[in-house]
Amino acid sequence: MESVDNNSFFSRIRNSNAYRKVKDFVILDHRPGMTMAERMLTNKDLYPVPPSKRLWGPWNFISFWLADAVNINTWMISATAIELGLNWWEAWICVWVGYLICGILVATTGRPGAVYHISFPVLSRSSFGTWGSLWPILNRSVLACVWYGVQAWIGGECVVLMIRSIWPSFSHIPNTMAKSGTETYQWVGFFIFWLLSNIAIWFPVHQIRHLFTFKAIVAPPAAIAFLIWALVKAHGAGPVIHEPTKLGQYEHAWVVINGIVTCIDGFATLIVNNPDFARFATTPGAVHWPQIITVPLAFGVTSLIGVLVSSASKAIYGTTLWDPTQLLASFLDHSNAHGVRAGVFFIAFGLCIAQLGVNIAANSVSAGNDLSALLPTVINVRRGGYIASIIALCMCPWNLLSSNNNFTTYLSSYSVFLSSFAGVIIADYYFVRKGLIRVAPLYSSSSSSPYYFWKGINFRAFASYICGMLINIVGMAGSTGQKVPKVANTMFNLNYFLGITVACLSHIIICKIFPVTECGEKMLSEVPEEADDYLLTLASEDSIDKDSTSEIYIDGLPTEKEVEKDDVLSITSKKLSGCFP
């Protein structure tokens, strides 16, 4: 009798208006007739980008990287190499070489997204398998959430400088958070930056290109103004640029290699998640030279400004301040003049926008795409971005960045895992499948799908990934302070190169021994129409189902029916245009 009452109670809850409203809000819309397995592979944000949303042209990618280059990490990228003994121009050459390689790699990983208009989570299904792709997606989503918090804390330091410029006493407010390991004024700056980031997360990816355009207008002039101010204040470039190399020939070579790899390690996330942006490209060519040229140019100039400003800081204060926020804080500590405060405010504002842009690009968007792919029935890109934001707030990033914490070393070393993922994806797309991807099967849970492999897992990709990871794992332990053989530490100087090369070659060899299906006959046997054909099929099925309210959604925002109709018509006209003389 009690069981009947319980069933009746739960039945009343399920039939209540409140329950239905909550369910309708939490559960994302899906196309009718889909099985639960199919719903776990699709949602509005995972579909290929329709023509009306392919708005990123070459200049958008150029402005994206011009904006992304101006950030505090890039500003300080040469510091390690110089402190290890290189002179400034040797460290700068390392930066140019490192970021040139990064530009080539992001163009390489971005091309599949630009051709088929699919994100990294969907692309990884073609190499790791329908369900096996969840492993690289999970890895990258965790890393993106952690880095989101770290970058937000750095952005908060810029906000603190802006507030101090207006109210100099702000840094002296009572500390009510001593037990939390931080100062109240620092936490307030972090929280304000965190709130501002949440506004940017609301907008879909095809629209936030305007944020990067704004950042490209604001951040570089702020960096140049900072450089001029520091050089004038120091009456020159300072002593750092006159310091000679302090290394022997053998050590010199390895420090140069380490300087190059350090740049690539910091780019590891962007190399993997470039399809998340490239999918919005107007043409595949928009992701090639604009990225290959702009990345080393923009990041090289930013690092040079960082070296010159830091060198000037030594002439001004007797110590080299590599962190620009510390130097700006020193300006405020030594002068209360209105001109100094105004200058610090506007430069800090530029750096704040720079940090906001890099956090959205490298962490928020990638976390949103990844979390959306992990649980597509309830998470879209927007919700995923907000989940990452909440995780970042809860993990107390100030503790992770404390001087006695090795966590930042672990974060930097994590690139050995991402390099293996990149190696497998590059090998699979360019050398195994030769650019041929069937888009529709990427969203199918059927065992007949060419990407289902064994129970949805491609053992070839995982074997290759493990090979690329294992060659670096001992050196990674050494980088965190563990005792390991000297040769492992030496090899770890090549960590990204080793990881991506071993994973790439292993995948090519294994796929030669155990061939996969659906491969092109020659290099770049791409079929760009695959994405449009799949979208056209979805639109046709929806039009047949008269009662369906299902639509194709992009970036968490439903497209208007008129826009959807234009998308279908543009696809149809493209297909029909070849049928008439």
From Swiss-Prot:
Residues bearing the modification Phosphothreonine: 572
Cleavable signal peptide: none
Q: Which InterPro entries match?
A: NCS1 (IPR012681), Pur-cyt_permease (IPR001248), Uracil/uridine/allantoin_perm (IPR045225)
User: Any idea which UniProt keywords this protein has?
Assistant: Membrane, Phosphoprotein, Transmembrane, Transmembrane helix, Transport
Which CDD domains does this one have? Answer: SLC-NCS1sbd_NRT1-like
Topological category with respect to the lipid bilayer = Multi-pass membrane protein
A Pfam family? Transp_cyt_pur
Q: Which GO terms describe its cellular component?
A: endoplasmic reticulum; fungal-type vacuole; Golgi membrane; plasma membrane; plasma membrane raft
**Which ranges does the record mark as transmembrane?**
62-82, 88-108, 143-163, 185-205, 212-232, 252-272, 292-312, 342-362, 384-404, 407-427, 461-481, 496-516
The Swiss-Prot or TrEMBL record annotates one GO molecular function as: uracil transmembrane transporter activity
Domain of life, per UniProt, equals Eukaryota
Per the record, the GO terms for biological process are: nucleobase transport; uracil import across plasma membrane
Q: Where in the cell is it found?
A: Membrane
Q: Does the record bear Transport in its keywords?
A: yes
ATP-binding in keyword set: no
List the NCBIfam families: ncs1
Q: Tell me the function of this protein.
A: Transport of uracil.
Family, as annotated: Belongs to the purine-cytosine permease (2.A.39) family.
Q: Tell me what this protein is called.
A: Uracil permease
Which organism is the protein's source? Schizosaccharomyces pombe (strain 972 / ATCC 24843) (Fission yeast)
Q: What is the lineage of its organism?
A: Eukaryota, Fungi, Dikarya, Ascomycota, Taphrinomycotina
